[in-house]
């Protein structure tokens, strides 16, 4: 994604002081242009302030952003910001099915995104999303997903 010009951000409700060192230790920090912790801004998810901030800094409209999350607050924040959300069926969601939040797509394994990442002809359908140009897109990732998403989303493709 980085080579394709897609900028990524990590947005979490965990304090930033814990997130950045962990990313650096795992040699993943360089993949994220923005790291927004729960104490970075006055508001935490599900407030969309962090998403609005990242989109403004990237110069990317909501129609060209994608949010990958694993909790109710992730889906709510994405919806409030007008951003499509791919939700994982596992993760921190207080035992409730994430599908109840009606994200654009629910997957139970990040590897399900791989066909769209590795094969330029493969398509992942996300309703109501406009196809962005590769340079004008951003992926926002939350919580512990960043490790898996970096590997899985090497070449993200989707269409409306």
Curated annotation (Swiss-Prot):
Residue numbers binding Mg(2+): 70
Reaction catalysed by this enzyme: 2-phosphoglycolate + H2O = glycolate + phosphate
EC nos: 3.1.3.18
Gene Ontology MF terms in the entry: metal ion binding; phosphoglycolate phosphatase activity
GO cellular component terms listed in the entry, alphabetical order: cytosol
Cofactor: Mg(2+)
Pathway: Organic acid metabolism; glycolate biosynthesis; glycolate from 2-phosphoglycolate: step 1/1
InterPro entries (alphabetical): HAD-like_hydrolase_sf, HAD-like_sf, HAD-SF_hydro_IA, HAD_2, HAD_sf
One Gene Ontology term from the biological process aspect of the record: DNA repair
Keyword annotations: Carbohydrate metabolism, Hydrolase, Magnesium, Metal-binding
Entry superkingdom: Bacteria
Residues that span the membrane, as ranges: none
Protein function: Specifically catalyzes the dephosphorylation of 2-phosphoglycolate. Is involved in the dissimilation of the intracellular 2-phosphoglycolate formed during the DNA repair of 3'-phosphoglycolate ends, a major class of DNA lesions induced by oxidative stress.
NCBIfam families (alphabetical): HAD-SF-IA-v1 (TIGR01549), HAD-SF-IA-v3 (TIGR01509)
Family: Belongs to the HAD-like hydrolase superfamily. CbbY/CbbZ/Gph/YieH family.
Protein name per Swiss-Prot or TrEMBL: Probable phosphoglycolate phosphatase
């Amino acid at each position: 994604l980085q080579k394709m010009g897609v900028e990524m951000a990590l947005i979490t409700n965990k304090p930033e002081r814990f997130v950045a060192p962990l990313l650096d230790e795992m040699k993943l920090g360089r993949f994220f242009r923005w790291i927004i912790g729960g104490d970075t801004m006055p508001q935490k998810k599900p407030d969309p302030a962090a998403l609005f901030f990242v989109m403004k800094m990237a110069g990317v409209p909501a129609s060209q952003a994608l949010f990958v999350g694993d909790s109710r607050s992730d889906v709510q924040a994405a919806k409030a910001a007008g951003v499509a959300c791919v939700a994982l069926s596992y993760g921190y969601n207080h035992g409730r099915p994430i599908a109840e939040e009606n994200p654009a797509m629910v997957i139970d394994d990040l590897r399900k995104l791989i066909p769209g990442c590795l094969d330029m002809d493969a398509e992942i359908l996300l309703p109501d999303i406009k196809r962005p140009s590769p340079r004008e897109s951003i992926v926002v990732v939350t919580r512990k997903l960043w490790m898996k998403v970096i590997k899985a989303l090497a070449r993200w493709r989707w269409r409306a």
